[in-house]
Amino acid sequence: ENNRVVIDSRINESGTVYYASDSDYQKLYSVDKNSANRQKLSDNSVCELEMYDNNVYYLSKNDRHLYRANDITGEEELINKTVNKIAVDDGWIYYQESDGGKKSGVLYRMNIDSGDVERLTDNSVRYPKKYKDYIYFNLDNDNIMYGITLDGTSLVKLSMGDSDVKLYPFNCFYHGDYLFVEN
């Protein structure tokens, strides 16, 4: 067996690394911190890895379905069939619903324990990115950058988005309480 592993997406939780292996078509694996006990967790090609409460949440690259895989039992469960982007935090899954194959869609959050779903935005959004207590995004029809609180109660406009200045969440990086934008 090839002992060389190329890692694409990865997350580290208490000494275990979860990753999509480039050498196995982005299948989901885990390995402990000393590179022993490598274990395949899914036959799906995966992306958008998130860890919460002994579960790895991910999107299947083939159909963009949202799954949960238990890191102990290896059990997989289909959570949602229409997802583009995900973030998991404090008992909630935040996701962008797929809009007919487009890279835009309405933002939702789902309670992990109850399965209750709440709509966060009325309009379709692009490029959602969660940081601390906000999800940043552009609307589908403009270049203005917004932030919305995780419960959807407060919307903040962060840029004017005129024709000369276009701000996108994927051009941002975060440090402490600051949001930095590369333009």
Language-model-detected regions and their locations in the chain:
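Structural motif
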Residues: 24-29, 63-68, 101-108, 142-147, ...
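Repeated scaffold domains used in trafficking and secretory/extracellular systems
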Residues: 4-12, 44-53, 81-90, 122-132, ...
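Residue position within the beta-strands of beta-propeller blades
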Residues: 17-20, 57-59, 94-96, 136-138, ...
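Short, intrinsically disordered, charge-balanced linker/junction segments flanking boundaries
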Residues: 1, 177-183
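Generic beta-strand structural signal
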Residues: 11-12, 20-22, 51, 59-61, ...
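Short loop/turn segments that connect beta-strands within beta-propeller blades
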Residues: 32-36, 69-74, 111-115, 149-153
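An edge-strand/N-cap motif at the start of beta-rich repeat modules
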Residues: 1-36
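Beta-propeller fold detector
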Residues: 1, 39-43, 77-81, 118-122, ...
